[in-house]
Each structure stands twice: as C-alpha cells, then as structure tokens.
C-alpha cells in the first residue's frame, strides 16, 4: 500500500518482480473535496468482447489527457471459445471456476491497447453481467436449470477473480459470495460520482426477461435493481453532495426506450430500468423533489451511443426533465457498427426524449466546467482493424 500521497497531483509508477520490470505507468490523486477545480476530463467505456473486435478505441483514448476513466461493465465475457466471433478467440469453455475466471481476466489483460490505457490514468470500474453470467440477477443464473446455491459458488469465483484483477479499494474485498462494489468519489466540488452495482442485489427480471409493455410486473413496487441498502446509500450520497455535477455511473439504460415492431403498444427491455419502473420513478422523483444539482447518468451495456432526457415517466414529454443520460457504445462488442439504423426515425418518433443515437464502436469523452458539460463521441467504422 502506498500512503501519504498529496491531493490533485500526478504520480508515476513501475512494478519490478523477479528482475522483470513493467512499463512506467501514471496515475493521479483527486482534488480535495472542498476545492473548486476549473475543469475535469474523463472518458467512459464498456463492453469489450475480444472475440468480436480489437480494442482500437483505447489507442485513441490514450492520446487524450484524461483525469480518469469509468468502465461500466462487460470488461470480460464468459462465453466458450468461438461463441461470439472469429476476430480472436477466448481460451477454453464457458468460465465457471476461480481458475477459469482468472485465466479469462489474464487473457484480456494481455491486450496491449488495454494495458496502454490502464497505464495512462486511474480507472473507476463496475461490473455488469458478463463478468459473471449473461443477464444474471442476484443469485439467479440465465440458465433456468441452475440452482441458486450452485450459482452462488460460481459468483464467488467470479467476484474473487474480479477483485484480484481490477483497480479496487480494500472495501471491495469479497466476503463469501458477496462483494461491495458501489462507492463514491469526487473531483473537488466540481463533480461527485456514485458508482453503482446493478446486478448483485437486483430481483429477477419481470416478464421472463422478454421485451414487454410497462405492465403490472414491471411496475411491481417490490422489484429492485439496486436493493434497499444501495438505493438508500445513493439517495444519501446525493443529498450530501457538494458537487456542481452529480454523476451516476451504472450499467443499463435508464431511458424508457420502447420499440413497436408494428404493434400498437411499445415494448421495453425488462433487463434495463423499464423492467424496474417503480424504483426508477422513485429515484427520479427523489432527485426532482430534493433539487439534486445537475444529475447525469452514465450507461453502457447496449453497444450504442445515446443522449437521453430523463423524466419520472419518459412517456410524458410535458413533464420536467430531471436528469440527462449519456449511453456510451462498446469498445468491441457487436463487431462493426453503423452510424444510423434503418428504423431510426421511427425509434426517435416513438421516443422523443432521445436526442442522439449511433451504433458505431468507440468511447465517450466528457469535459466538465462549473457551467458546461461537453461530450465528444469517438467512433470507428470497423472493429476488426
């Protein structure tokens, strides 16, 4: 452990083991909470299946002068070799044991562009589902025949390997089958950020995780994505915040994006926040009632870029905007992307709170001052280059 570091300054570091030396990396400490930095610059990224593409976006990101990086999940993928693509191949079968997860993390860490970016600045990381199992929820596996007790054994292995391989605080040391990942950070009084865990405490996806209208199951007050303890912690953190900007770094789309498929009613993802509409409305109502300063939600997961206005109910455009949401595309997952999709005009017509949408690969860079938030979307046409 390195102690007595001064606030708001850069440090350089190098590792030496058995006569072998690493490249020289750099990191920085954040400004003191009660100071007022003029500017902050960061990037956020997610979803980097090495089978579906190269991590080219990190080469561009490493050219930027960033204070930090948020990674919003799907840092690794659990699938068996060849399941997702042919650009590169995972080693072995679908990962389940501690050894499996350690090897998969090591394989991803071998990527030179990922190494390059880790050596540039500090990272705030959180997981989504693929660090463990696709669309998992608490102790419930995507595979219906897996018992919760068996899935928790797998979860403990995944969490242990994640902690060993990711830049995390001591407060995140795993305990049995659990690991506390949600936490706070700040960049002086310019920004405070709450990093969430949207998988470990969530109830099962309603409607069998099938795209559905906002029905009774999606509105169930007992359903939760965050769990009671984390939700209360988030509210308290927002109340106590002194930041001009309040960043909520999390996994899945909070915007209520519905698709019609030529049907009268819109259908919504039950794995995203529309599947937990009651809790979503409660959080946004809280932000509005408490007049939280400039809440901005950062999201990954769906391999595309979005800029959304967030309301308590996004279907009611005549109500006030409570927060903004920026959804960042994938580093590699999904393979080659596209600038516009075929039905984009209808998508935005059905969901007028969407202000931008794009499906190329890349990352998002954000620059904050006391008065402005600027997003630059960096994209690439091909994932195999």
Regions found by a protein language model. Name each.
Residues 1-380:
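Metal-dependent phosphoester/phosphodiester hydrolase catalytic core
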Residues 381-385:
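A short, hydrophobic C-terminal helix/tail in secreted or cell-surface proteins
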């Amino acid at each position: 452990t390195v102690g007595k570091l001064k606030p708001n300054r850069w440090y350089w570091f190098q590792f030496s083991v058995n006569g072998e030396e690493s490249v020289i990396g750099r990191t920085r400490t954040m400004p003191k909470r009660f100071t007022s930095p003029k500017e902050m610059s960061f990037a956020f990224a997610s979803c980097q299946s090495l089978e579906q593409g190269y991590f080219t976006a990190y080469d561009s990101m490493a050219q930027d002068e960033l204070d930090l990086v948020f990674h919003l999940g799907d840092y690794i993928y659990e699938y068996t070799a060849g399941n997702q693509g042919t650009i590169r191949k995972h080693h072995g079968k679908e990962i389940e044991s501690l050894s499996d997860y350690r090897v998969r993390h090591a394989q991803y860490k071998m990527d030179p562009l990922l190494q390059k970016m880790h050596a540039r600045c500090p990272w705030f990381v959180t997981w989504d589902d693929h660090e463990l199992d696709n669309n998992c929820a608490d102790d419930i596996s995507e595979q219906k025949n897996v018992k919760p007790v068996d899935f928790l054994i797998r979860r403990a292995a995944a969490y242990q390997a994640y902690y060993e391989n990711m830049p995390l605080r001591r407060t995140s040391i795993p305990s049995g089958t659990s690991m506390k990942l949600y936490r706070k950070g700040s960049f002086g009084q310019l920004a405070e950020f709450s990093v969430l865990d949207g998988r470990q405490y969530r109830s099962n996806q309603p409607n069998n995780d099938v795209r559905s209208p906002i029905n009774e199951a999606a509105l169930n007050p007992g359903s939760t994505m965050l769990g009671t303890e984390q939700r209360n912690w988030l509210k308290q953190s927002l109340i106590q915040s002194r930041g001009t900007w309040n960043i909520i770094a999390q996994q899945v789309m909070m915007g209520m994006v519905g698709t019609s498929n030529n049907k009268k009613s819109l259908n919504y993802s039950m794995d995203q926040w529309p599947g937990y509409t009651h809790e979503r409305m409660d959080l946004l109502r809280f932000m509005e009632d408490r007049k939280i300063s400039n809440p901005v939600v950062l999201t990954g997961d769906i391999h595309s870029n979005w800029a959304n206005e967030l309301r308590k109910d996004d279907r009611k455009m005549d109500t006030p905007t409570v927060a903004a949401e920026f959804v960042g595309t994938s580093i590699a997952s999904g393979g080659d992307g596209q600038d516009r999709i075929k039905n984009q005009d209808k998508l935005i017509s059905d969901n007028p709170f969407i202000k931008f949408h794009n499906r190329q690969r890349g990352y998002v860079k954000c620059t904050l001052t006391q008065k402005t938030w600027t997003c630059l979307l960096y994209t690439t046409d091909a994932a195999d280059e």
